[in-house]
Amino acid sequence: MGGLRFGFVDALVHSRLPPTLPARSSMAAATVMGADSYWVGDHLNALVPRSIATSEYLGIAAKFVPKIDANYEPWTMLGNLAFGLPSRLRLGVCVTDAGRRNPAVTAQAAATLHLLTRGRAILGIGVGEREGNEPYGVEWTKPVARFEEALATIRALWNSNGELISRESPYFPLHNALFDLPPYRGKWPEIWVSAHGPRMLRATGRYADAWIPIVVVRPSDYSRALEAVRSAASDAGRDPMSITPAAVRGIITGRNRDDVEEALESVVVKMTALGVPGEAWARHGVEHPMGADFSGVQDIIPQTMDKQTVLSYAAKVPAALMKEVVFSGTPDEVIDQVAEWRDHGLRYVVLINGSLVNPSLRKTVTAVLPHAKVLRGLKKL
């Protein structure tokens, strides 16, 4: 069984380097390593608490990134990256909030990027996170309902053929609205939905070109959710096999198991486990430090967490859970883990290089070659 494709995703954090240099360097690496796509995140501030964004926990990365919450705006950056884009690389946002921007603006931004890239833009979209909405006055009581309406609005505008359109909606009503940007050669950007709960999975089946969850932790969970997406697609009269099964996953690798285990023990890496719902923690006999019923990454507000709180939470992360949250191990072990996910339906993985946040500079550097070996192995799956 073959055909697995992969892409890279980066956070857009302001650094001491020229604004586009890190992203363009990553794009070049993606091209060399055979990636299909390059993605950027969409955050007003970081998901890593600023209280631990220091050299003690981030190592050399903290020297280059003095303010972890200084995030660039993604569509502006993607528009810049579109010029000089390698001929086959696709560009995407992973993922934009459905409610923080009016969906008409999102539809316009994605369609513009699609024209700039000659048909290689991807609109990744989800409900977003509380940290990027509620503190800024964006209503957060019904994020899934807002998402459904935003997605329906984007599709309605793209399908309007430049005619006036009116559409009732509790969140994004259209009254004689007009959307006249053309698709690129008859095709709009693909919509990749980050969905996890039952209602979001159904919306994915109705509207999306791909499903790209971020916090599914076990391959068996992935295959069950994928079946829900495909069932919803069938119910909507769509071809269920036309929806690309994707996922965002971190990779922690190194020269040997000791280096990998050390990286998995880092506080920054452990913080990713806070984004996993409480039920996954309970499976390992530990209550989520933010409550047994905590829903996960969408409800974290990291900028309010002080250092001691973060350290106390990190100390509670079960080692077995960390090994579910990310692909980890020697290159061969990581490739085997990805292959297991492929056997459960995964066909596209968007990778986060978690090895870069090891506090040890030496071990960050020595993880480069093992990481490259993983990527070479993925091309054979």
Curated annotation (Swiss-Prot):
Record bears the keyword Lipid biosynthesis: yes
Coiled coil (residue ranges): none
InterPro entries noted in UniProt: F420-G6PD/mer (IPR050564), Luciferase-like_dom (IPR011251), Luciferase-like_sf (IPR036661)
Claim: Membrane is one of the keywords in the record: no
Annotated GO biological process: lipid metabolic process
Broadest EC class assigned to this enzyme: oxidoreductase
EC number: 1.2.-.-
UniProt GO MF annotations: oxidoreductase activity, acting on paired donors, with incorporation or reduction of molecular oxygen
Keyword annotations from UniProtKB, A to Z: Lipid biosynthesis, Lipid metabolism, Oxidoreductase
Function: Catalyzes the reduction of the keto moiety of phthiodiolone dimycocerosates (DIM B) and glycosylated phenolphthiodiolone dimycocerosates to form the intermediate compounds phthiotriol and glycosylated phenolphthiotriol dimycocerosates during phthiocerol dimycocerosates (DIM A) and glycosylated phenolphthiocerol dimycocerosates (PGL) biosynthesis.
PANTHER family: 5,10-METHYLENETETRAHYDROMETHANOPTERIN REDUCTASE, PTHR43244
Family, as annotated: Belongs to the mer family. Phthiodiolone/phenolphthiodiolone dimycocerosates ketoreductase subfamily.
UniProt-recorded name of the protein: Phthiodiolone/phenolphthiodiolone dimycocerosates ketoreductase
Source organism phylogeny: Bacteria, Bacillati, Actinomycetota, Actinomycetes, Mycobacteriales
